[in-house]
A protein has these predicted regions:
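Sec-dependent signal peptide recognition
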Residues: 18-28
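N-terminal secretory signal peptides
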Residues: 36-91, 126
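Hydrophobic h-region of N-terminal signal peptides that target proteins for export
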Residues: 27-36
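Short strand-turn-strand beta-turns centered on an Asx-Gly dipeptide
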Residues: 165-167
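Mid-length scaffold segments of soluble, non-membrane domains
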Residues: 81-158
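Flexible glycine-rich active-site/ligand-binding loops centered on an Asp-His dyad
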Residues: 170-196
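N-terminal secretory signal peptides that target proteins for export/translocation
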Residues: 1-19
């Protein structure tokens, strides 16, 4: 009798341990799935980030290729408060946004600066002096970019665009006009490439 009770107790314990192990395994799998987020060209981005106490959701990942050689240059990730496929609603959003640019190859600083100047000239053809002064400030904060380095831009309505280079905060470029022009570069009528824009709006990253 005592032996049977002991055996039953042991089996019960084993059942509890097995069940607990299964639950722990499931929780670990779910945690890893959440942590993995989305991937493009071997670069992983989380599904959510926190900016100034606000939870932002990944709207899309876009891939930028070199114009002529068609080699991969960078993957960009756009985080927003409310996801959307409408570029105008994102450009004119009154909520915070974060754009992360993860480079897939080395790029010289002069190439980066020339691209910014061209991009802002497209979205603001009248080129007001105040805007171009702020573009000059942005360019002054940049340097040669190496593979796997990141530029992060945090848009805060009423404040402007905070610029972070490889985790180092460079400063904030003020003005809602600048922040709208900045988002128009990526989502407007003349983006660096149609494929990049499509990806940031929720399409395929390829």
């Amino acid at each position: 009798m005592h032996r049977e009770v002991c055996e039953n107790f042991t089996l019960h314990q084993e059942g509890v341990v097995t069940t607990a192990s299964a639950i722990n395994g499931l929780l670990l799998a779910l945690t890893m799935a959440v942590a993995q987020g989305k991937e493009c060209k071997g670069v992983n981005f989380p599904d959510q980030v926190e900016v100034g106490g606000s939870d932002l959701t990944l709207n899309g990942l876009g891939l930028q290729k070199a114009t002529f050689l068609r080699v991969d240059v960078y993957v960009a990730a756009l985080y927003v408060t409310v996801t959307s496929h409408d570029p105008n609603s994102l450009i004119n959003s009154d909520g915070p946004q974060e754009l992360i640019v993860h480079f897939l190859r080395n790029v010289g600083v002069e190439d980066v600066r020339k691209q910014w100047s061209r991009d802002f000239a497209h979205v603001a053809p009248d080129r007001p002096v105040s805007l171009m002064q702020r573009v000059a400030t942005l360019n002054a904060w940049l340097s040669d970019v190496k593979r796997d380095e990141r530029l992060t831009f945090i848009r805060q309505p009423g404040e402007g665009v905070q610029v972070i280079v490889n985790g180092v905060v460079k400063g904030t470029i003020p003005g809602d006009d600048f922040s709208r022009d900045f988002m128009s570069i990526w989502l407007g009528a003349a983006p660096p490439s149609p494929e990049l824009r499509r990806g940031l709006l929720g399409g395929k990253c390829d």
